[in-house]
Amino acid sequence: MQTSDNIQRLLQQKIDQYKGVITPEILNRFSGEVMKEINQRSLPLAEGLSPEQLHQLLHFLFTERSIVSLNASIPDDVALKSPLLNLCICYLQIIQREEEMKLTKTEALPMKIVNELYSKEYISEKIWTLPIKVRTEQDSISIQLVRVISKLAGMTKMLHGKLSLTAKGTSLLKSPSKLLILFTETFFLRFAWSYFDIFKSRQVAQFGAGYTLVLLGKYGQHEKEVNFYAKKFLEAFPMVADEFESGFSRSPEDAFCHCYITRTFHRGLMWLGMVETRETGNRMEGTHQEWVKTTSLFHDFLKFNNV
């Protein structure tokens, strides 16, 4: 039944109940019932979620009000399936070992530290099929990401050009599960996903990331093209395409998809260990396709309530 039909039905019920005598008190009560009806209606283009559920996903992700939360009881050995978590632990352990790590004049990590981190190969960074040669911190987005998240989360501090652990950082090294929870919350809620790219929109993909998690929870166990999720996201939030312009033979929708896939999968969920991807075809021949599905960590770490 359409929302307008429901409103008409409620109105008729009130008229019948009060024999046509509608007081301000009754009108206020009726208005509240109408708003509740609107906010709890199912939206077909948003996988049947209601406006109320979408609002909670957008503004209260991972809280008790959201339909998506993190599993606080995740075992340490399961948490350690996350590549970014392992890189973060290694980073914090190096700082702990050095006690006070002296940075370069530009406040970057020393080259030997960057090489030590990158040599662990927790995360593969490449441009298409070409490996990136890492010399400095600026050559590795994943290392920069771990450093930024660690600072935002209060795990490290810098004083007089020297980097050291906080008491919080030292404590979290003993609990990979708690570290993963804090890292994930900071990545989704405080770190700006646009930090490492030049896309025009600053909020696309991150604002609404909770909805992507719902989509993956529903469809992710079976491999699908990455564009499937971008298009599903666009169906629920069509206005986001307005933030992109046509150019280089791309429509605004195509430009959005490229931004969404890069931020959500390539520099987010893949590195967190929540999804895995597979490529087929050839880019130069125009036959390239990328496929994605969720990992066991995704299902062990995320909880979906009333979805």
Residue ranges: model-predicted function:
Residues 137-152, 159, 252-272:
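Short amphipathic alpha-helical interaction segments
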Residues 117-118, 122-140, 232-259:
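Short helix-coil junctions and helix-kink-helix linkers
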Residues 39, 100-119, 123-126, 130, ...:
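Charged, alpha-helix-forming regions
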Residues 2-140:
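Short, amphipathic alpha-helical interface elements at domain boundaries
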Residues 76-83, 131-142, 161, 200, ...:
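Conserved aromatic-histidine-acidic binding/catalytic patches
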Residues 144-146, 157-196, 276-307:
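Accessory beta->alpha helical hairpin/"wing" motif in late/C-terminal subdomains of nucleic-acid enzymes
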Residues 223-246, 276-277, 281-282, 286:
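Extended intrinsically disordered, low-complexity coil regions enriched in Ser, Thr, Gly, Ala
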Residues 56-98, 176-232:
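Leucine-rich, amphipathic alpha-helical/linker segments
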